[in-house]
Amino acid sequence: MEPTAAGNLLEIMDLARTLRQEQLFIQQEQTAFGQLTGALETNAGTITKLAFVCAQQRQILNELLVARNDHDPLLSCRRASAYDSAQFMDAKQVLPYEHALAYEDLFNYLYNTPYLLALSLATADRLSLLSSGQLGQIINTIATGLYGNAINTKDVELLLKLLRELIEIQLLGSEQPRRLLRTNSSSFARLYQRLVESLFSARIFLTAALHAPLMGVLSEHDVWLDLDPHKLMQSFSQKERERRFGQAGEGEHGEEYQRNVARFHAETLGKLHTHAQVFVKSLQQSWALFPSSLRWLLQTLSQQLRQTHRHKEQEIRQLLTDLVFTHFISPAIVSADLVGIIDVNVSERMRHNLNQIVQLLQRLALNDEGSELVQLMELLMVGETGEDVVAILPQQTDFERSQLAINQRELSQFVEFFRLLTSRDEYDVSAEERQRLQRILGRIPKQQQQQQSQSELPDATANSPEKQQNNNNKKNNNRSLMRLGKAKKKLANSMSFSNSNSNSNKNLQPAVEQLPPLANGQANSSNISSASNGDLEQCSSHSGSNTSLSSCGAAPAAPTPAPTAVTNDHQYCARDEPVLMFSIYNASAKSKLKPLTEEEVLKMNCIGQDGSNLLPAVACTTGVVAPSSNNDDVSSLEAMRRPQDDASIGNSDNLEAISEAAHSVASSLDLEEQQERDVHENEDNLSDMVSANVSGRGTPNISGRDTPSSQVTDGDGGGGDMAHHHGHHVRAANPQMQKMLLSKARSDIDDKFCKFELKKFEVDENVSIISDTWSTDVLASDSENTLDATGSERGGDRGDRGDRDRDRNFSTPLIPSAVVLPGDNNFVVEALARAGAGVISGPHMDASDQRSESNWSTDVLASDSEKLAEIDTDDNASITAKSDIGPGSGGGAGVPEAGGGGGVVGDDDDEDEQTPGSSGDGEPDPDPDPDRERLRNGSERSQEDSAFFDAVNSYEDAHHLYHGASSLARSSVRTSYHVMGGESSFQQQYKSSGAEGIGRKTTPLMGTSCMRRQTSAESSISNQSLNLEEPPPPPRALAKHHHHHQHRDRDRDRDRDRDHREHHHKSAALKKKKHQEHKEHQHRDLIDFSDCSEDKDEEEQPPGLVQQLLDMFNQEEQQQQQQQQGCSSQSSVEHRRISMEQRSQCIDGRRNGILAGSMRRHQSLNYENHEIMLNSMLPKTDDDKQELLLCAQTQQQLQLEERAAAAENSCSNRAGAGAGAGARGTSKPPSKATGAIPKSISFDASADKEQQPYRDRERERDRERDRERDRDRERDRDRDRDRDRDREHHSAGIFNKLKQGFFKHRRGGSSSSKNNAIAIAAPSSINPNPSPSSATDPGGRSVSFDPSAGVCVSFGTHYCDSSEDILAKYRRKVSSSSEATNSDSTGNGAGGGAAAAAAAAAAHLHKHVNGGLLPGVAFGSVKQKLRTVLSKTDLHSGDFRQTTPMRPLDATTPLQIYLQIQLAQCISLQRLPQISHVAEALRCLEQLERPQHGQLLVELQHDLQRRQSYLQYLMRHRQQLLLRSEQLEQLEVRLRSEARSCQRCLMQSLVRLYLAWARQQDKLEQFQTEFGQLRASDERVELVEEFVEQLLQQLITSADLLDDWQVDAAREAIERMLLELMYQQVMFPNEDADVSRDTVLSAHIGKLQRFVHPAHPALCIAQEYLGEAPWTFAQQQLCHMAAYKTPREKLQCIINCISSIMSLLRMSCGRVPAADDLLPVLIYVVIMANPPYLLSTVEYISCFLGRKLDGENEFYWTLFGSVVKFIKTMDYLD
């Protein structure tokens, strides 16, 4: 019962407020997404630049300090600062565009081919083509530029693969591989060093393992360590010896001296071993943090060395120890300050001590068999050997690199390096790789050419053949080079590599010129191997221009000799020299940041909750739609570049597989075991029979040709061609069908074969009958499609196989494998899509084709039934279906072939499939599975031909593959193979079903063409497993199909078919078992479809143009046919058109989503295949809308004609049951299979034909009364569905089933399900008058509510209202004219009784559709408009109430009242856009009945609840964006810190070398003399500060320091060097007195440690703070003070100590602690730490910094000083 009017109005106000809140939140979040996404993209580019700068500065530091190549420190600092302020520019803005593309192609090619890079480097090493410095530059370019300094997971992976290839090429072939590991001795050693320097995980491990031991060593400032103490004795000065050991002499003095020396030796060795043990223990504790990438590399090296059997185990162990200790851990210990492990400046004495410790550790690791380090090395070898690189890398998603940075000098060197290699015969690469490299390099100008073009002296090398050749082919390039600026001149003048063999190598040019251009992109498979995410060939998206530009005759010439020398000049990077940014083709970077749309999230939500079975279908659509949208040219480039792609299905072998697949089954199998489910399986079997038999298998076609159009064109043109490039998306959803069909085809094969006498093809009576009867007026040229040509365009070895293809493709050239029937959207979608893709090279199917096809379908007479009784089941499963549903054609047949991740989910029958890494060039496996071969091409067709594919596929796939998992689990797992590569798991879950919208945005036709090419028979066959009500049929039918045809084909391919049969026999039992298991779980899983059907379908629906065009064509056809045919043929035509109309209604109903959840659940299963996927017909672009407008206009004209035809050809009405059967497509299956077609074939049309004119007038007069009657009929029809089905089950023959096969896909409801018996909302809207035609008879196509749903609650969101509105307008005009027009609004052009029945059905539909909407009003559109209005307006006053009206039926509903209030408010506020919106909503509401207003509100509330998942997604997505943004910010901070650390180290080195000059040494000696003469501390401080400033000014002048931070860094470095030099004097000005005082205080504190504890009453630490005791980190900070030498660094340790205590106290109490809280804790920490030289440290800091402190630092320092004073006065006796 409805609530009161006032209550309703309040509810509407509340609903509007809620919708407004939701809308505001969504808008705010989307705005924030845009801002965050932009910031993330900017940060990602910044990180790429920072990584380049860090790497370059690190290299400069290594050259200066580690390599010790006598580099000028001043020049090194200038280079570092130049990189810090470098200008990064897009290479396309600096270089000529074609040159920039060529560079990008080179980088992207090499980026994805580690083997080629490894071979190049190994060749350069072996031939010594380059000097050590030059090769180092090349390695630097690869590590820094190509692999981005290894900060990204993908880059680390590729760098590891490169090292693995170098292991195989360099180390395994060497007799002494250990030598090659020495620094700079091989490319492997260089790259390994760059890897360990760049890996952040390596730095984490080193910091964890080495920081504490290092600080311990550095804290002992007065300690000398050496393995040979005698060397230390010699290094001491005479004064130092006397101080340490006393006077050397005779007697007692001599003995004491010797004792002191011996004690010193023992202490030195003891301390050395103690420190070494500390390092060993720390390594043991941190060994679990050893980087997994390095561990994988070591395991790979160990395994491969052992496999050679040329090296002893000891040698292998030593080599691995060298890699870990000598080249990884030891350099980090010695140069800890340079690596960044510690921030302490390491003096020469400390570095000497660390060197001694490192030598001892290496001895232990190499020579001591029982040492702990040897055990640690053995631990590294434990684990998974042979593991893939990806498995050991962290799967991070925070940073995706899309750019590559390289300066022009390195760019020139890199190109010249490969020019030099490709000109050498010793460069042992394949001809294809060499050819591709030469073509790319040929597009890049040489340095000589650049110099000449820039200097405008083209005649300098006019006689050079290289120059002539490039002048002929690259005139434009040279002209553009003439315009190059200063940057180009630097590039031209930069270093080039010498080539001593260039003259002899010029002979290579003719051979290179004779090489054919890269046919169809013969890219090396390694180029593809690393692009599993589908983005790879975008990695070479310009590679198409490689083939086009470089194959035009611009053959690369051998480089000419040029004098080369690595000088210091080229090392200098000028400040104005830009760093070039090239693109790395990585689309996943952007796809990760793109949020899902509302509809995508809602679809995913449905899948996750109730419709897991739909997920794979959506995932498939994602792959199909997106790639095919705007990749017409890209896909062609990819096709040219992917010769070995396993998705290359356009080759002749695969075409042969299609042909054999379609005809490998005998044509006269009985139908015994299919009768139970032929209601569904034979929905389109007539179309299959037509396509299979019209051309006559084995006989010449009507046109005299055997054309493979129905085999190849449908699947390969639209699906195959796109599957060729995006195969893993296209075929991803096929496994489900494979399993279903395999399971059916495996049983009782021998028994079936024994039933038949195999005959020759030429005498097949079925061929003759059907051909003679149906195809006399058909010419092959009418609709012969050209996938043959398409395949030949793409194929590699197509030539000699074309004849075989034609021999094997026997289907009619007129009919596509999915026969295009009225309302079937398949073929024209396909043709248009492929025409748009540039694939069609033959005529499309036009109206004449469809007219001819209608002739076939209507010319069949009852007398043919006896002969047709033996129609084979291949005819019942169409040709394309045969290729799709072959027993061996499991999910993997369609999926893994595509080259994507989909292949992983193939079923058990997929062992011999091609995997992404295998060759897909058309060479089949030795024993290919025939049905899998069929699927490789047929699967694409099937996906496009029928929407069934997606739903069944999603269910079957998920069910078979993830059988025991939940729906969500299955859907999630399935999704991961179809989402765009590199997405986070979170986004994959949402993106799985929604990503199809990506492609949908760009092309309405191509997207669905790949998806929809599925035959009707396949749809119906698979659909039987979707039928909830029917028992699981025996999985036997397809075995009959395939094997009988295999016998018929035995004359052609006897051996191949025998192999196919053998394969079928092997897997028959397994498939049967799997199918039965699937059936057992069917009821449980299929329920999960419930609420996602209409959401799910939106993308899978083909463009609206196709169906409407077919309607028009078939109206004309059927009018002509029915003038010549009898009533039965008229019924059949009408029947076909009825089901087409029903399908249209379902489309509209699904589009508007007015389906109850429970009904929708059944409908998604039983509305047949098209129904499951229909909503992809939603027009998403303006083109779609224009197409629909055109169709609607044409419809009006056709409807007028149809009315005339209906008046002329009216036939007598049929009985109720027969009418019901005909109206529903006679979907009841016969209970017994006789194998023959009954003489009496029921082509009953819908009932109530005689009442149709009356209903027209009745509806115009009193719409409400008829609507109520229709609702009653609806209810009764739903109750009687099973009974009707059983009756028809016994009365229908094969033609009855064939008739069902034509139409069941095209109507809204399935007769085999009680799906429509349940209505959720407004029971009054259910029709009390049962009419069989009310559910599925043709109604006005203008009505967009599924007829069988009654008044239901929509759980979907609906889109494209504008196109719906346009169609609705035309529909109103049509339906308001007359009943005949109404009946014909869906294209029913049948004459006589057929037209009358269709009109009656239209009348019913118009009355009960949308729960009783007026004709032409789209319920979903009204709801969408109402949502828009309510979410954009808000009441400024709620002071309104409604009184109860006198006449309730005439009253204005609360919804109208609210909108009237809104309209008045908008007029008052002059909000023009809102006025128009509200007025339109009011207009739409006026056309609805009062109960429907309540229904609208109920659905809006349900939609609001459903959209909660979208709001949650928005919050989660924002959280992810925020997290990713923070990660990028932290990465940026880390990189900036690394850059600053490098520059500080450079400045420190510069200052050290600067002070080492002789002139500065004199100044230092003079300063020390003056300092020693002063006694007052103030005077000493002033002298030090003056001297520091003097040195700083000189350094600024000489080193050209401009930046403030450089000046500050230089000042700190000078202070540190100077105070380290005079540390004893400044720290202990009173020498021994200060030392003794510190010793006394240290002993006092040591006694206090014995009894002081945190809870000691003298400390008075609050109880709440005791939980964090003993504050270990704070104690460590105080202990580390001794390692630092400057007062500022020591003060920073104290501040760090106090800050850590404060943070812990704040964490304990939740508030900022007071000084009284801090002081007792600090006392305890100082006592327990007992830092050395405490008093001297306090005096040192106070002397130099006491007056300069302020703020927090001053407070902390004052606090610390008071603590020290308090401790001095503490009495430990208390």
UniProtKB/Swiss-Prot annotation:
Residues 688-713, 1011-1027 have a biased composition (Polar residues). The record marks 182 as: Arginine finger. Residues 157-396 form the Ras-GAP domain. Residues 1516-1546 form a coiled coil. Residues 1635-1774 form the VPS9 domain. GO terms for molecular function: GTPase activating protein binding; GTPase activator activity; guanyl-nucleotide exchange factor activity; small GTPase binding. Its main location: membrane. Residues 444-480, 517-564, 661-727, 784-811, 869-947, 983-1102, 1115-1142, 1214-1342 are annotated as: Disordered. Residues 519-533, 540-557, 1115-1125, 1310-1335 have a biased composition (Low complexity). The keyword Glycoprotein does not apply. SUPFAM superfamilies: GTPase activation domain, GAP, VPS9 domain. Residues 887-905 have a biased composition (Gly residues). Pfam families: RasGAP, VPS9. Residues 674-683, 794-809, 929-944, 1048-1060, 1077-1087, 1246-1291 have a biased composition (Basic and acidic residues). Keywords: Coiled coil, Endocytosis, GTPase activation, Guanine-nucleotide releasing factor, Membrane. Residues 1038-1047, 1061-1076 have a biased composition (Basic residues). Acts both as a GTPase-activating protein (GAP) and a guanine nucleotide exchange factor (GEF), and participates in endocytosis. Belongs to the GAPVD1 family. This is Receptor-mediated endocytosis protein 6 homolog. It comes from Drosophila pseudoobscura pseudoobscura.
